[in-house]
Amino acid sequence: MNAWEVNFDGLVGLTHHYAGLSFGNEASTRHRFQVSNPRLAAKQGLLKMKKLADAGFPQAVIPPHERPFIPVLRQLGFRGSDEQVLEKVARQAPHWLSSVSSASPMWVANAATIAPSADTLDGKVHLTVANLNNKFHRSLEAPVTESLLKAIFNDEEKFSVHSALPQVALLGDEGAANHNRLGGHYGEPGMQIFVYGREEGNDTRPSRYPARQTREASEAVARLNQVNPQQVIFAQQNPDVIDQGVFHNDVIAVSNCQVLFCHQQAFARQSQLLANLRARVNGFMAIEVPATHVSVSDAVSTYLFNSQLLSSDDGSMMLVLPQECREHAGVWGYLNELLAADNPISELKVFDLRESMANGGGPACLRLRVVLTEEERRAVNPAVMMNDTLFNALNDWVDRYYRDRLTAADLADPQLLREGREALDVLSQLLNLGSVYPFQREGGGNG
């Protein structure tokens, strides 16, 4: 059956700032306390969506979350009106204010893990929300992510959206950023690779930085998504590269159709994994980048592998890269060698995503891949699909509500909270989502 990959990109939120919240993500730590530009961040992301949509790659948008998220501050014991809560937390515990103001939901590769209908036992598209248990600021995302996905994939005959796994370390799940799918055409059954960093009883794990994904979580997600057991491989990420800043697998590998583009050191027991894939995936091609060409350190600093590998109608592939790759002589030299070599990659597309990159999120972090048949695509909420009208409406919306300068101190401004709620109220109507945000259901909005 014919099917297409639709990239659902996260729209950067109004409180995008640099707080260094993500230990193990070296860009996040390095840019801590720098001044951010939320308006520019949102526009950089929107431009990527529009350019790819114009090039014929189906694109859609997933909206930001409510931030600062006051209900969590109340759970932490701060009392009073919303304004009083903001004032108290800013004075007594500013780190909590930064955490509940994080715009991290923009990286929707961590929103959920997807199983296309061609891979599932019941023939539905399954989406399991990620619990993002390893980082407090990200663990807050799951309930609203679930509401948003149910508003976008709202046809229960075709889509099953599953709640996140329990919030415990044993079941730490980081979503599609630790998941790849390999196979022929999108509509054909594929081989799903669930990548984990640690498992109970196995001493092979990183020592410097945390392994955010557990094998136990990956196995549970595969069950929830009803993936045919014959179409699943569980693979461990190389703990040594986690300790070098590869906090998700999409920082060291990316797949599309029959191609796996990865670093030579991406996986534990890599030669064994690739042999297994060659035996089980027709036409499988591994493009392994040797450490002598690109070091793990350079891969992390440029986000070479946090790229999007997209299929054109003629079977060739485009690699979507951050500008940092072009600015690194060694990486750019390797990429031009790659273009000249015998493989399906025939085009490089470069985007300026510096605002997201400075927090450790490249092109692949910003998108959730969902393979859909034509019938399934028609069942998706049409208001989120990117086109000229939506692009212009979202640009105008960003111009109206987003600030062009934000520091950690600005997060305590009650006006920022009011601006954010008004903006999301308008956006949820524009995208026909209903009342997906807690403040709307509490009577604070019109959505």
Swiss-Prot record:
User: At which positions is substrate bound?
Assistant: 19-28, 110, 137-138, 212, 250, 359
Active site per UniProt: 174, 248, 365 (nucleophile)
What Enzyme Commission number does this protein have?
Answer: 3.5.3.23
In terms of SUPFAM superfamilies, this protein maps to: Pentein (SSF55909)
Q: Which reaction does it catalyse?
A: N(2)-succinyl-L-arginine + 2 H2O + 2 H(+) = N(2)-succinyl-L-ornithine + 2 NH4(+) + CO2
Q: Which UniProt keywords apply?
A: Arginine metabolism, Hydrolase
Q: In which pathway does it act?
A: Amino-acid degradation; L-arginine degradation via AST pathway; L-glutamate and succinate from L-arginine: step 2/5
| GO BP field | arginine catabolic process to glutamate; arginine catabolic process to succinate
User: Which GO MF terms does the UniProt record name?
Assistant: N-succinylarginine dihydrolase activity
Q: Which domain of life is it from?
A: Bacteria
Keyword Hydrolase tagged: yes
Q: What role does this protein play?
A: Catalyzes the hydrolysis of N(2)-succinylarginine into N(2)-succinylornithine, ammonia and CO(2).
Q: Which family does it belong to?
A: Belongs to the succinylarginine dihydrolase family.
- Subunit and partners: Homodimer.
Q: What is this protein called?
A: N-succinylarginine dihydrolase
